[in-house]
Amino acid sequence: MEDLNQLKLVLVKNKKTNKWLAEKLGVNQTTVSKWCTNTTQPDLMTLKKISKLLNVSVSEIINFD
């Protein structure tokens, strides 16, 4: 299965951690970890919040290929 999101890569590029993102979104760090490993996916509203927090477009987080 191909990775749907590139969240882990985007976090690294922005020098941010799973813990930082979890705190900003008010979610459990385990949830962010699951997003980063593509075990589960964030919903569209959460993707929009993540893109604003990291100052990137949603298309930079999602792998459309």
Regions found by a protein language model. Give the residues of each.
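Ser/Thr-centric signal marking residues that sit
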Residues: 17, 30-31, 46
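Conserved hydrophobic/aromatic packing and binding residues within compact polymer-binding modules
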Residues: 7, 21-22, 32-35, 61
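Recognition helix of helix-turn-helix/homeodomain-like DNA-binding domains
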Residues: 27-41
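A short, Lys/Arg-rich alpha-helix, primarily the initiator
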Residues: 1-17
